Amino acid sequence: MALLITVVTCFMIILDTSQSCHTPDDFVAITSPGHIMIGGLFAIHEKMLSSDDHPRRPQIQKCAGFEISVFLQTLAMIHSIEMINNSTLLSGVKLGYEIYDTCTEVTAAMAATLRFLSKFNCSRETVVFQCDYSSYMPRVKAVIGAGYSETSIAVSRMLNLQLMPQVSYESTAEILSDKIRFPSFLRTVPSDFYQTKAMAHLIRQSGWNWIGAITTDDDYGRLALNTFAIQAAENNVCIAFKEVLPAFLSDNTIEVRINQTLEKIIAEAQVNVIVVFLRKFHVFNLFTKAIERKISKIWIASDNWSTATKIITIPNVKKLGKVVGFAFRRGNTSSFHSFLQTLHMYPNDNNKPLHEFAMLVSACKYIKDGDLSQCISNYSQATLTYDTTKTIENHLFKRNDFLWHYTEPGLIYSIQLAVFALGHAIRDLCQARDCKKPNAFQPWELLAVLKNVTFTDGRNSFHFDAHGDLNTGYDVVLWKETNGLMTVTKMAEYDLQRDVFITTNQETKHEFRKLKQILSKCSKECSPGQMKKATGSQHSCCYECVSCPENHYSNETDMDHCLLCNNETHWAPVRSTTCFEKEVEYLDWDDSLALLLIALSLLGIAFVLAIGIIFTRNLKTPVVKSSGGLVVCYVMLICHALNFASTGFFIGEPQDFACKTRQTLFGVSFTLCVSCILTKSLKILLAFSFDPKLTMFLKCLYRPVPIVLTCTGIQVVICTLWLVLAAPSVEENISLPRVIILECEEGSALAFGTMLGYITVLAFICFVFAFKGRKLPENYNEAKFLTFGMLIYFIAWITFIPVYTTTFGKYLPAVEIIVILISNYGILCCIFFPKCYIILCKQKTNTKSAFLQMVYNYSAHSVDSLALSHVSLDSTSYDTATTNQSPGNKMTACQNDNHLPAQVLPHTGTAKTIKASKTLRQKRSSSI
């Protein structure tokens, strides 16, 4: 194909090597008269040729690289204006147009803008400087264009001088939405803010977070890249590299920069997705070289080139990988298709691009449609051959389908909307004016109406928002190979307001899912149960995966941090993907330890019943009588039974009633039991006391019923205050990581301690009294056993304190149960078991005579000891008196001693002791 083009070129006859325009009219590309003139700016050529003059002169040069797609855009504007002229919208008012070729150069666009702003019907073609342009009549009333954002920015700054409406069909730079800087600019496409937002959303949804970006070094490229970078960061997407290419093909460094960009793409092997904000000719050159280097990636196309046929038809373009792009929402363009079918009959006298296209088609008449675009772009305005009009028409007729194939429906529709918006605004403005007159209205008046106009394309209604934008949305397109040809397929729609992709069928949904199979990440994906941990890289997308700690979880991939479980109700192990509900634990009835403790409690109750039966059947025996009688024994046995029964409230699911009952029941019943033991200790001590003063004191103190009631009553008051002021209650202990301990919270540690402390004080008093009576007769040694019982109690509860404070969990109640059982069994065994042993095994000693003999022997032994003590004491006194006293004093002493002789004093003392012994035996017998 290249050889054929070269051959054709060699036979060209160069007819024109002069400058592109001699007069301003030569600068006009397409023109048609009308009552109201509309300007148009289109980059019909992709570059302007450089001047060979030295030094360079300020002259407009010829252009090269005919852009078929942009040429079709000029035809779309012409067709849309003719649709309005042929309708009844303006009632006889005809719209005219002046369309200029910017050659993708801002300079050329500004030159055309100067002509737009020049004074109407002035032969000098000048822009008149004025302080007030309110009544100024320029050459045109409004401008459609330009396509590229950088050009529109420059043009808009000039049009702002007269507030001339400018409606762009393709410029998407976000900065143009700023109505302070660009008050007269409007557009029929969305801002790049929405496009970059949609791109970032697509990338995130596809699971990519490590991408590259390529843009141009101009206003559009820099602004688009900055906006995209912000949107990408908000979606946790990192840009591995940002490559910037020169804005114009005339730049000598563009080839070098493209090669450097491709080297960067190859070097970043983990980057498989690249966002491209470039012009069509940049993409064409980039892709051509990328195919040569066998680079295959996912290319995210901007709306500038996503549907460009020139790029889609690049040979072997499928080797580049997948192309996913965003295109302007398309509408009904069927009438434009019909217009193209009759293009060969359209007059081209005032349509230089059409005439040029016809000549290019003629020059490339032997080229196939697939290569025609490349052939056409190789010519410049200075290297064309001219043919007869009839021959040109024949070639155009043969190439009608080729033109339709190069149509970009989204852009064609946007141009139609721009023309329709102006048409409806002019209609509203001309309802009370004669718009056939050139001075019917000024451009700034049209701008005011245009901002608020509601217009239609025949089906849908539209209006500009506060920023002058028409947010029609985007089509998400995918390049697919069909029958050996690359085609553009609509994959989804992007809703700007809801920020969602709307798929139309199952096939497109499948295409979306296939995108997720491609990996483009800096780091390996963190699985559920892990979280990302930053590394030394400056990018947040480069990380390492670490497991979630205990009580944390992550249920999605690539989570930035693990989520905390609700520690009160849930838990999670290390590297968990979910939270598990905590198991509620308490000392349940089916627990082996609980069963053992209950068995011991029931055994204790059985012992109590057995002892009660034994005592009842042996009610008249001395052992039972010496124990205080059946009433005292029953009271103590009932207290023991209640103590054993209270352990049942420590087992099972805690309830408020059980929590309040268990400590109160134990405290009151155990206090009553200890109070009874206290009275027994006092009675024993009183019965066998030899000290007259102590005996008198114990007789005054010994009041059994008041002692029991008082001691027990104090404990009742303590427990009552406890229940009223800070009653125990059920509490969920959540301090353990995996379980909830359902337990009784004692309410007040002070009250709990006071209750136990009070019992301890009573037990200590009992211990002291019992210890004093530990040397009683062998068959009457109850005090000795009481001493052992109290010692067991003290040991048990002293051990309880550290064990209770250090034990945690569901077995905490078991600690108190064990202590209760030990203290209860200790007292029960020490008080009642010896008596039962005597009743059952030593019945001979369980008689009144045996007890009297035992008491007599003990009393005699006690009296002999007492007599010996008195004799020793009296002898010592006598010797002292004999040695130290005078005869007179001796006489006084004798008189004081009942007037007995001095030599019988020892015998007199012995007699008194024997008398006391008789009295003591009578007292012991009465106590029995």
Swiss-Prot record:
Instruction: Supply one GO CC term from the record.
Output: plasma membrane
Q: Which UniProt keywords apply?
A: Cell membrane, Disulfide bond, G-protein coupled receptor, Glycoprotein, Membrane, Receptor, Signal, Transducer, Transmembrane, Transmembrane helix
Tell me the Pfam families matching this sequence. Answer: 7tm_3, ANF_receptor, NCD3G
Listed transmembrane segments: 595-615, 631-651, 670-690, 707-727, 751-771, 785-805, 813-833
Keyword Thylakoid (UniProt) = no
Q: Which GO terms describe its biological process?
A: adenylate cyclase-activating G protein-coupled receptor signaling pathway; calcium-mediated signaling; G protein-coupled receptor signaling pathway; positive regulation of insulin secretion involved in cellular response to glucose stimulus; regulation of testosterone biosynthetic process; response to amino acid
Q: How does it sit in the membrane?
A: Multi-pass membrane protein
Gene inactivation effect: Deficient mice shown normal body weight, an increased fat mass, decreased lean body, hyperglycemia and insulin resistance, proteinuria, renal calcium, phosphate wasting, impaired bone mineral density and defective testicular function. Conditional deletion in Leydig cells leads to decreased male fertility.
Determine if Transferase is one of this entry's keywords.
no
Tissue/organ expression: Expressed at high level in liver, lung, spleen and heart. Expressed at lower level in kidney, skeletal muscle and brain. Expressed in 7 dpc, 11 dpc, 15 dpc and 17 dpc embryos.
Q: Which InterPro entries match?
A: ANF_lig-bd_rcpt (IPR001828), GPCR_3 (IPR000337), GPCR_3_9-Cys_dom (IPR011500), GPCR_3_9-Cys_sf (IPR038550), GPCR_3_C (IPR017978), GPCR_3_Ca_sens_rcpt-rel (IPR000068), GPCR_3_CS (IPR017979), Peripla_BP_I (IPR028082)
Q: Where is the signal peptide?
A: 1-20
The chain's Cytoplasmic topological domains, given as residue ranges, are 616-630, 691-706, 772-784, 834-928
The post-translation modification note in this UniProt entry reads:
N-glycosylated.
Q: Which PROSITE patterns match?
A: G_PROTEIN_RECEP_F3_2, G_PROTEIN_RECEP_F3_4
Among Gene3D superfamilies, the record links this protein to: 3.40.50.2300, GPCR, family 3, nine cysteines domain
Q: Where in the cell is it found?
A: Cell membrane
Q: Tell me one GO molecular function of this protein.
A: G protein-coupled receptor activity
**What are the annotated glycosylation sites?**
N332, N555, N567
- What spans does the record annotate as topological domain Extracellular, numbered to this chain? 21-594, 652-669, 728-750, 806-812
What does the sequence similarity comment in the record state about its family? Belongs to the G-protein coupled receptor 3 family.
Its function, per the record, reads:
Receptor activated by multiple ligands, including osteocalcin (BGLAP), basic amino acids, and various cations. Activated by amino acids with a preference for basic amino acids such as L-Lys, L-Arg and L-ornithine but also by small and polar amino acids. The L-alpha amino acids respond is augmented by divalent cations Ca(2+) and Mg(2+). Seems to act through a G(q)/G(11) and G(i)-coupled pathway.
Name the UniProt record assigns to this protein = G-protein coupled receptor family C group 6 member A
Origin species:
Mus musculus (Mouse)
Q: What is the lineage of its organism?
A: Eukaryota, Metazoa, Chordata, Craniata, Vertebrata
